[in-house]
Amino acid sequence: MQKFIFILILCLFGRTSYSQEVLPLREQAKWVDELLNERIEGILPGLMKREQIDCWVLISREYNEDPVLKTFLPAEWLSARRRTMLVFYLNPQTGKIEKHAIARYAVGKSIPASWDMQKYPDQWDALVQLIASKHPTTIAINYSNDFAHADGITHTEFDLFKKYLPDSLRKKMVSAESLAVAWLETRTEREIAIYPKLIQLTHQIIQEGFSEKVITPGITSTDDLVWWFRQRIRNAGLDTWFHPSVSIQRKDSVVFDHLKAFSDRPREDILQPGDLIHVDIGISYLRLQTDVQEHAYLLLPGETQAPASIQQAFSKANRL
């Protein structure tokens, strides 16, 4: 049986076993909690000052979490617990963040519990009392018309919060949109240092998926490859934050439609020599995500490299 060689258009990485580079879950949890504490102490004060927000309130009930609130939970918490209320106050005298969890217990090691249940049996009363004691100029809540991630407070929680707030505090309510987006998009130096390895792991998974170990021309389908990527990511101890996609461009009479290739492609489209294969995958690790797309060309019999037209197209595209 003739073997077909795959030429990866983008750069390749070494053959190091990426599964051996992924930390055990227990070690990952330690990293996640350390990185979270660094983020709260290191970047949140500057972001709140920049966005002119001195009090940020996040409220979620268990299993219906605000996506931003979830980023403040410790690694062992897979969801909020009952009703979780977090308050971050930027002290103007010290310039430091005061962290409070109006909850039955501390939220990990980073956010201590601040609910005196004997004095304030009603959790909402405890929240309002804490906010009032800080005399904030703004009370930022996660609601937004434009950014879904910054629109995490539910209708019920929003209405209850307004109901309990006195008029003097209610008029200070503002959208936390700019702060929520800034929190999600800003990374610490330590997180940035992790990203090259995370990108490399993603490329290595793609490299293996584009190899003869996985693809047999005339037999392997795009859906076979999609599910191979999904399973390989899981087997490596990683997660994926969106379902992988694999599409094909080939010489035929059908005009290529990128929307159809993404959402309405044949699930059993068999890979053939001469195909230009495209993959889009993203992995999650230590609460960081990648989003990587690569192409590969499947050589026709007698070819030793991709056609000049394809090489030229990628040379021009890679200038960006």
Please state what every model-predicted region is.
Residues 20-320:
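Active-site neighborhoods and metal-handling regions in enzymes and metal-associated proteins
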Residues 4-13:
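Sec-dependent N-terminal signal peptides
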Residues 15-19:
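Sec/Tat signal peptide C-region and signal peptidase I cleavage site
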